[in-house]
Amino acid sequence: MSASRFIKCVTVGDGAVGKTCLLISYTSNTFPTDYVPTVFDNFSANVVVNGATVNLGLWDTAGQEDYNRLRPLSYRGADVFILAFSLISKASYENVSKKWIPELKHYAPGVPIVLVGTKLDLRDDKQFFIDHPGAVPITTVQGEELKKLIGAPAYIECSSKSQENVKGVFDAAIRVVLQPPKQKKKKNKAQKACSIL
């Protein structure tokens, strides 16, 4: 594929899990040190993945409940979702299946989801857990289990602060759109054929 294709990629997840930081880290190679709820503008860039040039449109969303009615407006036309949770927040991990998957299936059925665990740098930071005794780390195994539970084609852990795996998140999102995983459901449909005698 040599022609440029537009891919709309929308980030979703609880407030303060690091969606905006992930986008800023990816697009500008910098890490914002202060938490400012969703100020990232839509961004577009030409990216080459596996020899294919795509125009990647990045859309940020607000995770806070105040935006529950407005947020789905950005889902229209999405090619892929990046569903983020914090690797140091059990609540954000649990909300993936409790809140976000039902919302995405309702407003954007069939759109692939890349599951992303953010704040990887803090998961092994002992001082962080001393300072935040209520924080619960999420393991890679738990992330992989959640990926299977929600049927996501990819799960990636990253750190916007250290930039570890940040590019990998967006490369995975592009790959999921350009090379969708093979669907296993086709065999099931053939087995469920109706016979009238």
Swiss-Prot record:
The modification Cysteine methyl ester is found at residue 194. Its main location: cytoplasm. Ubiquitous. Preferentially expressed in mature pollen and pollen tubes. CDD domains: Rop_like (cd04133). GTP binds at residues 13-20, 60-64, 118-121. It holds the Pfam family Ras. GO terms for cellular component: cytoplasm; membrane; nucleus. Signal peptide: none annotated. Residues 195-197 form a propeptide. The keyword Cytoplasm applies. GDP binds at residue 160. A motif (Effector region) lies at residues 35-43. GO terms for biological process: small GTPase-mediated signal transduction. One of its GO terms (molecular function) is GTPase activity. Keywords: Cytoplasm, GTP-binding, Lipoprotein, Membrane, Methylation, Nucleotide-binding, Prenylation. InterPro entries: P-loop_NTPase, Small_GTP-bd, Small_GTPase, Small_GTPase_Rho. The keyword Lipoprotein applies. A lipid is attached at residue 194 (S-geranylgeranyl cysteine). It is a peripheral membrane protein. It comes from the Eukaryota. Belongs to the small GTPase superfamily. Rho family. PANTHER family: RHO FAMILY GTPASE. May be involved in cell polarity control during the actin-dependent tip growth of pollen tubes. This is Rac-like GTP-binding protein ARAC6. It comes from Arabidopsis thaliana. The gene is ARAC6.
